[in-house]
Amino acid sequence: MPYRKYREKKYEAKYREAFRAFQQKLGITFTNEKLLIQAFTHSSYVNEHRKKPHEDNERLEFLGDAVLELTVSQYLFQKYPTMSEGELTKLRAAIVCEPSLVRFANELSFGSLVLLGKGEEMTGGRERPALLADVFEAFIGALYLDQGLDTVWGFLKEIVYPKINEGAFSHVMDYKSQLQELIQRDGSGNIEYQILQEKGPAHNREFVSRVTLNSVALGLGSGKSKKEAEQQAAAEALRKLKEQS
């Protein structure tokens, strides 16, 4: 056997062992292990090893991107029943953006498993954010093809959804959503908004709103619309709760 082929087989055997250990760590066993390996195969590796172009992870990345958007959308839709479409979209974008995906990938040491060409390896590709985000999406695509949506949901429940529950993305929410998320996380009870006052002429109305937690007043706010008044009341409530914590 030519030395080059011997070296490649030894290299691939080492990675197969690493992928088995990775599956044990996740508690997931792929029926088709080739899908798992493909999810971590960068185009530079395919080019250098004269493999077919479709054997890299780009198609799986395409699929995983769609699966990730669907599952995260469903989770947010169920978790925040009163959140507006605009706020849901903004929150989802923060969860599936490149920096977030890189964070998830790094927590599971995805970079150490990526199959790279020598050039990409030498230029630090293993730690390149865009590459890691792509690999995370490709892994989601491979997991979906191999085991279906339920397993993807279970994986995200362990890796991604806890970050949402811990408030990691609260900074992109409006004040009402932030307050709702904080109350849900602490299990403190129910919040309600009440318009206490409407004043001024029809063309220049001002509304005063109060937000309560279990019937105890948390904050007051005013604005040119009911929505704005409620947002300001929620902002005051958040300030008070953060001062108390």
Swiss-Prot record:
SMART domains: DSRM, RIBOc. One of its GO terms (molecular function) is double-stranded RNA binding. It holds the Pfam family dsrm. One of its GO terms (biological process) is regulation of gene expression. It catalyses: Endonucleolytic cleavage to 5'-phosphomonoester. It is found in: Cytoplasm. Residues 19-148 form the RNase III domain. The keyword Zinc-finger does not apply. Belongs to the ribonuclease III family. This is Ribonuclease 3.
